[in-house]
């Protein structure tokens, strides 16, 4: 999965997919009542990027729905996965459940079109704080209450705080999550980060009793760091330059082992090294 980083304006969906992304990451900020409000990152952000592009969250979902609904004039067949980077740091811990509830209602209405031929992409809810695991509970219970529990088949999870892998496993246990787990590891492109924790995550994925289905590394903009991440066995790379990742994947060293995921590739299924 080539994951376009910080895609917060509708116009950027086309831009990143046209550069080779089959997945995008979008920032979601919340108001003080835990409503998802904007797709917005803000300053500071990655080096070389404009930090302030934004849409209202529900407006963005409408654009995303069009980009992932077959038959729509804006449809991109290859855009198959969306990571919502949920900026829950502005919320109190006791608002996490509400945030999950409100997020589910927004997606149901504006992305899934109440289950009637809505967008088809798989969704990863990426949460920065292990203490906010109840966001997952709120999300799940709301879709059940709204009579669309089947949409949970399209939803996966990530805790993005680079926490100890054992602590992440405990948070999933509390949230009752037993699959659909992506594990991120990374840092802004302005700084360097080694691959030690990525290797631990890959080892968990490849073990017989691990909780991780997929591992992705962020934010990778250079060919050398792309090769290092692929050599470590990651499933996804988040980048500001999808064309760079696509170029490296077409090198002879990688064409035998990796290919770009399509809609038919289940993002919750584990492939071991």
From Swiss-Prot:
Expressed by the venom gland. Pfam families: GDPD_2 (PF13653). The keyword Nucleotide-binding does not apply. It catalyses: an N-(acyl)-sphingosylphosphocholine = an N-(acyl)-sphingosyl-1,3-cyclic phosphate + choline; an N-(acyl)-sphingosylphosphoethanolamine = an N-(acyl)-sphingosyl-1,3-cyclic phosphate + ethanolamine; a 1-acyl-sn-glycero-3-phosphocholine = a 1-acyl-sn-glycero-2,3-cyclic phosphate + choline; a 1-acyl-sn-glycero-3-phosphoethanolamine = a 1-acyl-sn-glycero-2,3-cyclic phosphate + ethanolamine. Its EC number is 4.6.1.-. Mg(2+) binds at residues 25, 27, 85. It is found in: Secreted. Its cofactor is Mg(2+). GO terms for molecular function: lyase activity; metal ion binding; phosphoric diester hydrolase activity; toxin activity. InterPro entries: PLC-like_Pdiesterase_TIM-brl (IPR017946). Its main location: secreted. The active site is at residues 5, 41. One of its GO terms (cellular component) is extracellular region. Binds 1 Mg(2+) ion per subunit. Keywords: Cytolysis, Dermonecrotic toxin, Disulfide bond, Hemolysis, Lipid degradation, Lipid metabolism, Lyase, Magnesium, Metal-binding, Secreted, Toxin. GO terms for biological process: killing of cells of another organism; lipid catabolic process. Disulfide bonds join 45-51, 47-190. The keyword Hydrolase does not apply. Belongs to the arthropod phospholipase D family. Class II subfamily. Dermonecrotic toxins cleave the phosphodiester linkage between the phosphate and headgroup of certain phospholipids (sphingolipid and lysolipid substrates), forming an alcohol (often choline) and a cyclic phosphate. This toxin acts on sphingomyelin (SM). It may also act on ceramide phosphoethanolamine (CPE), lysophosphatidylcholine (LPC) and lysophosphatidylethanolamine (LPE), but not on lysophosphatidylserine (LPS), and lysophosphatidylglycerol (LPG). It acts by transphosphatidylation, releasing exclusively cyclic phosphate products as second products. This is Dermonecrotic toxin LsaSicTox-alphaIB1ai. The lineage of its organism: Eukaryota, Metazoa, Ecdysozoa, Arthropoda, Chelicerata.
């Amino acid at each position: 999965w080539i994951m376009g980083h910080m895609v917060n304006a509708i116009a950027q969906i086309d831009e990143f997919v046209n550069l080779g992304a089959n997945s995008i990451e979008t920032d979601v900020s919340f108001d003080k009542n835990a409503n998802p409000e904007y797709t917005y990152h803000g300053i500071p952000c990655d080096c070389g990027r404009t930090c302030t592009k934004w849409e209202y969250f529900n407006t963005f979902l409408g654009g995303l729905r069009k980009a992932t609904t077959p038959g729509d004039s804006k449809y991109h067949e290859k855009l198959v996965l969306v990571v919502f980077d949920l900026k829950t740091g502005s919320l109190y811990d006791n608002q996490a459940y509400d945030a999950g509830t409100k997020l589910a209602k927004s997606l149901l209405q504006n992305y899934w079109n109440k289950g009637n031929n809505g967008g088809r992409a798989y969704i990863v809810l990426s949460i920065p704080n292990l203490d906010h695991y109840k966001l997952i509970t709120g999300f799940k219970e709301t879709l059940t209450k709204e009579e669309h529990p089947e949409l949970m088949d399209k939803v996966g999870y990530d805790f993005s705080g680079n926490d100890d892998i054992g602590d992440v496993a405990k948070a999933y246990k509390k949230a009752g999550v037993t699959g659909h787990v992506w594990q991120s590891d990374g840092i802004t492109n302005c700084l360097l980060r080694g691959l030690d924790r990525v290797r631990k995550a890959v080892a968990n994925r490849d073990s017989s009793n691990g909780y991780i289905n997929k591992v992705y590394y962020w934010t990778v903009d250079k060919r050398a760091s792309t090769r290092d991440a692929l050599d470590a066995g990651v499933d996804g790379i988040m980048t500001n330059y999808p064309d760079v990742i696509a170029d490296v994947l077409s090198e002879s060293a990688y064409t035998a082992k990796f290919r770009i995921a399509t809609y038919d590739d289940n993002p919750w299924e584990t492939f071991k090294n």
